[in-house]
């Protein structure tokens, strides 16, 4: 079935989703299964770059949501002490052996959990982490320990997502865009990117930076303010904006913001260590 036919079938099923259940068979189930297989293999993505902007394939998000109506809960092996989990989404590695791992070409360290319907490109390294369905992790990217990459989040190639960082997912509301980390980015430990924010190519987020859709992102060199996106090759740290005076005239509390302390070109980014960029 072509992508256009899949989209048509899934869009029609979405409009009639109240009548879809684990008993549903036929074209709808086949279309949803095929859509998830496309996501799992990397042949389709929830978001794709078109020129300088990102296009979201909402029909693929709908396929993911429909799969929860279609699929029943089942035991999933691999729990502690030979126990099992109880869920609707199996592991990406279910029934994999050496041949499948070698063909996939990425490294999966014990303790990582990757749900079926997510794509991991060759050369990626997965430390003990969680990657949700619909997510896309690019070639050569390091996903460090205790990282969460949420549903439909898009992480580019040659990125480093440091320990405990969160790349938030999005399934609902349906119109919400996924978080996108473009190629060659560094996300510091315990940082969090959420609510459809786009981190531009080559950017560096310091440890503990939190960015959501309403977070003020201030370029301290130009004074520009951004919301929802970090420009390419930005070096970003946590900061505060001055508070407004309280009614009695005393200083009010400052508000959190993210600060672009500098911007670097691709050549400088490639030659300069992360710590040096953050400290100069």
UniProtKB/Swiss-Prot annotation:
Transmembrane segments: none annotated. It holds the Pfam family Hexapep_2. It catalyses: (S)-2,3,4,5-tetrahydrodipicolinate + succinyl-CoA + H2O = (S)-2-succinylamino-6-oxoheptanedioate + CoA. It is an enzyme of class 2 (transferase). The keyword DNA damage does not apply. One of its GO terms (biological process) is diaminopimelate biosynthetic process. Keywords: Acyltransferase, Amino-acid biosynthesis, Cytoplasm, Diaminopimelate biosynthesis, Lysine biosynthesis, Repeat, Transferase. Pathway: Amino-acid biosynthesis; L-lysine biosynthesis via DAP pathway; LL-2,6-diaminopimelate from (S)-tetrahydrodipicolinate (succinylase route): step 1/3. One of its GO terms (molecular function) is 2,3,4,5-tetrahydropyridine-2,6-dicarboxylate N-succinyltransferase activity. Coiled coil: none annotated. It comes from the Bacteria. GO terms for cellular component: cytoplasm. Its EC number is 2.3.1.117. It is found in: Cytoplasm. PANTHER family: 2,3,4,5-TETRAHYDROPYRIDINE-2,6-DICARBOXYLATE N-SUCCINYLTRANSFERASE, MOLYBDENUM COFACTOR GUANYLYLTRANSFERASE. Belongs to the transferase hexapeptide repeat family. This is 2,3,4,5-tetrahydropyridine-2,6-dicarboxylate N-succinyltransferase. It comes from Methylorubrum extorquens (strain PA1) (Methylobacterium extorquens). The lineage of its organism: Bacteria, Pseudomonadati, Pseudomonadota, Alphaproteobacteria, Hyphomicrobiales. The gene is dapD.
